[in-house]
Amino acid sequence: MSETDAAATLPADARDAFKSPIGPVYTDAAALLADATPPIIAVGDVVTYHLVDAGQTPAVAVVDGRTERDAVRPAVRDAIPEPDLTVASEPGTVSVSLVRALVDAIADADATVVSVDGEEDLAVVPAVLAAPADATVVYGQPGEGMVRVPVTDAGRAEMRERADRLETTAAFWRLVD
């Protein structure tokens, strides 16, 4: 299996399962940060922008230069720290290289920005599954705000249920477990 191969793919009949937020939704980054516990892992450009703007650089940020399929505004792009590495991941998938980069970034003591050539939307799944206990994963909910996912047994169990709706490979589970 190559690094660019899909470790997980979202089948069309499972898309609805991923539309509802998996945690509380915030429109104010300061309020979200008051409820968050480190390390903070951000999935999405606009989420990362709001956290940085509120004074909190995420331990890990996964970005793709897009929001809701459009390029992010220059102010958003310019506020996000330069990527430490770039990986490819096609829309509707999570590539082996993206999962590996995410797992490695979570283990790294330094803040890491992972840029995705393609789409990072599904990166929230391996982020929650691979994050340490009591971490916080934050992702964007289109039209609503930022979702805070506390990495607890319950949060992981709910994300594992969603992961079970994906078409996954053995490599996916090896990397996130």
Curated annotation (Swiss-Prot):
GTP binds at residues 45-47, 64, 120. It comes from Halobacterium salinarum (strain ATCC 29341 / DSM 671 / R1). This is GTP-dependent dephospho-CoA kinase. Catalyzes the GTP-dependent phosphorylation of the 3'-hydroxyl group of dephosphocoenzyme A to form coenzyme A (CoA). Its EC number is 2.7.1.237. Belongs to the GTP-dependent DPCK family. HAMAP family: Dephospho_CoA_kinase_GTP_dep. The keyword Transmembrane does not apply. Keywords: Coenzyme A biosynthesis, GTP-binding, Kinase, Nucleotide-binding, Transferase. Signal peptide: none annotated. Pathway: Cofactor biosynthesis; coenzyme A biosynthesis. GO terms for molecular function: GTP binding; kinase activity.
